[in-house]
């Protein structure tokens, strides 16, 4: 494996289709923080790896650069802590606009929500 792919999140760990997002959002198990909302759906026991989908609406964050930055931060938090939420499909959604200087807070909120979901489910 080359070093450029060591720190990436595999495509098998991402929700990519609308039906996959819909299934998680319909399940209605939700955890919230100040800026983020985490939707969780437990998966069958034989399907143990965790997957994540991200929603950062244009209505909330107008600039694509900022939307992509937020998604990268959340994806990195998930990559480092995905063992905590094994067997779950997650959709992380931005609730309100954030300042670029709040990167550390967004990262920490994402980690906190993942751990909170793992403890309560």
Swiss-Prot record:
Is Cell cycle among this UniProt entry's keywords?
A: no
Q: Which GO terms describe its biological process?
A: tRNA 5'-leader removal
Q: What is its EC number?
A: 3.1.26.5
Q: What class of enzyme is it?
A: hydrolase
* Catalytic activity, reaction form: Endonucleolytic cleavage of RNA, removing 5'-extranucleotides from tRNA precursor
User: From which domain of life does this come?
Assistant: Bacteria
One Pfam entry for this protein is Ribonuclease_P
Provide the alphabetized UniProt keywords.
Endonuclease, Hydrolase, Nuclease, RNA-binding, tRNA processing
Report the GO molecular function annotations: 3'-tRNA processing endoribonuclease activity; ribonuclease P activity; tRNA binding
The cross-references to PANTHER family, in alphabetical order and at most eight, read: RIBONUCLEASE P PROTEIN COMPONENT (PTHR33992:SF1)
Q: State its role.
A: RNaseP catalyzes the removal of the 5'-leader sequence from pre-tRNA to produce the mature 5'-terminus. It can also cleave other RNA substrates such as 4.5S RNA. The protein component plays an auxiliary but essential role in vivo by binding to the 5'-leader sequence and broadening the substrate specificity of the ribozyme.
Name it: Ribonuclease P protein component
Q: What does the record give as the organism's lineage? A: Bacteria, Pseudomonadati, Pseudomonadota, Betaproteobacteria, Nitrosomonadales
């Amino acid at each position: 494996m080359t070093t450029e792919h060591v720190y990436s999140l595999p495509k098998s760990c991402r929700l990519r289709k609308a039906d996959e997002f819909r299934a998680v959002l319909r399940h209605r198990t939700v955890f919230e923080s100040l800026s983020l909302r985490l939707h969780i759906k437990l998966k069958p026991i034989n399907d143990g790896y965790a997957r994540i989908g991200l929603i950062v609406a244009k209505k909330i964050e107008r600039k694509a650069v900022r939307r992509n930055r937020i998604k990268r931060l959340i994806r990195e938090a998930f990559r480092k802590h995905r063992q905590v939420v094994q067997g779950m499909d997650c959709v992380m959604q931005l609730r309100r606009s954030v300042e670029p200087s709040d990167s550390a807070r967004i990262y920490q909120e994402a980690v906190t929500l993942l751990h909170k979901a793992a403890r309560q489910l």
